[in-house]
Amino acid sequence: MISLERRAGRPLRIGHRGAALLAPENTIQGFRAAIEVGVDLVEFDVIQRRDRELVVAHGLDDVGAETPTLEEALRFFAVEAPSLGVHVDLKSTGRELDIVEMVRRFGLVERAFVTSGYVGTSRTVAALGGARVGITIPRTVFSISENGRSAPFARSGLHALRRVTPTLVGPLLRITRATAAVVHHSLVSPATVRAAHRRGAAVVAWTVDEPDLLARVAAAGVDAVVTNDPRIFASTLAS
């Protein structure tokens, strides 16, 4: 099973949707861009199209000419990136067995990290065995958005959620049998990290693109950081 432990005292680098600030997201080109600048894992989204084909995209509106199928993406990592961690984020439900079997068929189980914001999906993947499993907290960034007219209410809700996140992490890990909590950077705190570590689980912060945020979550003790621009690691955590 893939390790999510820090290396050389720094969090692991996870390229978000490849490296979304450097190349088109969720594409083979994006995966190559992430590898070129240096990452420990590459993250990509998986959805089911209306024809039931599993493809690499965040949503149906994002499917285009460059969108690889899940099979094409897994073949890329099996052939062109034989030592890289593969972070598969499930945006659809109900195809867990098919996805895990495909990961297994390409010989990627030992370096796969499969995540979802859906409790049932994470629990199902964990029950299937093999791949490391993470539960995303919260399920979508819109749950904690501070934009628009509702910003004052969102901010108060965010503060409340940040306070209770340390108490939520343990039960979510227990219910899902996940071994990692994938926590939005705004909810990361030393208390949340300690709560996960007490259960033997890693903490992955998402999505961090600013050096000051990277420094903050690293200081909080997270084990890995998801970023659209992996280059920020070199400038922020060089020492």
Language model features by range: what are they?
Residues 1-239:
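Phosphate-group recognition and catalysis centered on beta-loop-alpha active-site segments
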